[in-house]
């Protein structure tokens, strides 16, 4: 019998015990005092036969299958997220390949391919071979702690290759054997009405728990019985495995005192347990149908995250050395997108574990409750006998399995099988809780972004594009929507650029929108000639800000100076954003005198322009990847694109 994923998962969810018991409890012979004690989590005392006579079993044929309308909706959302993550994974793989092929030399690519990512940080890492013994021990200890850190993107805290449905099916199959053993025992009890002595011997042999230990009498022999025994608490813990020992002792002590009434056994207790056992077989099939929910690609996503993390750290190292081949800003976008994709897959698997474990816990609670009800009814029958009956078995049942929480076995089972199940109180991880080294490095900041117009090389017309200025590059993107495009159409390394001049502030220029500046890329030989990039900005103040930032970043000599400058710009941006939030009236954005002075000082600084290293690193790529979302509500009216003008163009000075 086949099941769909969502329907199978939803069908396993059980109604609460109180909903299932509603309308099924008998009104006759129901003791209010016993109900009050049950609400307090206590069992009725078994010291008097009269109290047992008042304790009526609850007729409870299990009906564990219900449809919770909220569960399929949640599962559909997770299935949709998972499908999107798979599509994004394919797109992310292509984007990463494009980025690596353009920004990393072939020799470096070969080195990356030859290095095993899983080998990093382990004792087989060549960099670890020369460390002292204590350093190796400390490194391994730190590596193990990172694998269990819920904030680390390189840690997966839930099992990814487990088979929980097989384990749980085997567990409930063992429960069916427990119920079968109880049924055999109770059936034999109902047949000893006239032959007390002979029937007591029969009942002694009817205690058939092949995988449970019986004190001083029996121990499981076969491997199958021993494996089933591990599903339950050990002998002496007061749980279900103590039951066969107590029953055997009881029949040895009551060979001549048994006087039974089989009517209640054959009409109520046995049929209910038989219904429970039949329904449990259906539940086992439903559990096995959930096996496909635990097929996942978490390990594949983790390897991709490790790969991008390595590229991210290498790019930052290159930027700090002053010879960047790829921008950490772009790789960080790819890394964060991959982490989100990994968390979607991981949380889908986590949700599957939660659904299976919660449903299994509820199902086992019903099973244990049914066994408790059956044994309670049986104890009431035994209470009609002499005090020896009470001393031999009833008091022991009441102090052990009848008084245990229904989740006692389940909680112990989960804790003993932590490699196959998720701990009950383990929360799901969120992206905002993820942290990694160099996450807020200044070289990953966005110095400035917005729309610019760039003059075409041949048509002399201007096209519009969205630009992002980072400490190392000037990138052109197709749109400001960073969720759709994470790889730029074009990237210009600032180490190969200088800004030469900009237009003057005049009334006519402001009216006609002719606020321009020229960005020159240096020549790298015969193949890559220098170019003059002519950009046009809507306002003069905005042009000065672009000009000043590019001039400063392309002229700063080392990593520390760039970090100080970027931190200063970021601080000013935060102060400006805070002041805009406190303003209640809408005003035209203006650049303050302090900003004019700052950028004018930058534009007039004496940084050596000829000391810029020459790198053949101009990147022009097309992509469909996404970059983080950018609010473009304040730049809606500025929509330019980029073009290149040859350095030999004679019209450069005439058109400014």
From Swiss-Prot:
InterPro entries: AH/BAR_dom_sf, BAR_4, PH-like_dom_sf, PH_domain, SLM1/RGC1-like_PH, Slm1_PH
Modified residues (Phosphoserine): 626, 649, 653
Family matches, as CDD domains: PH_Slm1
Region (Disordered): 577-605
Topological type in the membrane: Peripheral membrane protein
Keywords associated with the record: Cell membrane, Membrane, Phosphoprotein
Span of the annotated motif PXIXIT-like, required for interaction with CNA1 and CNA2, and calcineurin-dependent dephosphorylation: 640-645
Domain of life where this protein originates: Eukaryota
Subcellular location: Cell membrane
Compositionally biased intervals (Polar residues): 580-594
GO CC term, one of those recorded: cytoplasm
GO annotation terms (biological process): actin cytoskeleton organization; actin filament bundle assembly; eisosome assembly; endosomal transport; establishment or maintenance of actin cytoskeleton polarity; protein localization to plasma membrane; regulation of cell growth; TOR signaling
Comment field (misc): Present with 2610 molecules/cell in log phase SD medium.
Record's function text: Together with SLM1, effector of the TORC2- and calcineurin-signaling pathways. Phosphorylated and activated by TORC2 under favorable growth conditions. Mediates actin polarization via inhibition of calcineurin-dependent transcription. Upon nutrient limitation or environmental stress, gets dephosphorylated by calcineurin, inhibiting interaction with TORC2, thereby antagonizing TORC2 signaling and mediating calcineurin-dependent actin depolarization. Also functions in heat-induced, calcineurin-mediated uracil permease (FUR4) endocytosis.
Assembly description: Heterodimer of SLM1-SLM2. Binds phosphatidylinositol 4,5-bisphosphate, which is required for function. Interacts with the TORC2 subunits AVO2, BIT61 and TOR2. Interacts with the calcineurin catalytic subunits CNA1 and CNA2.
Protein name stated in the entry: Phosphatidylinositol 4,5-bisphosphate-binding protein SLM2
Gene expressing this chain: SLM2
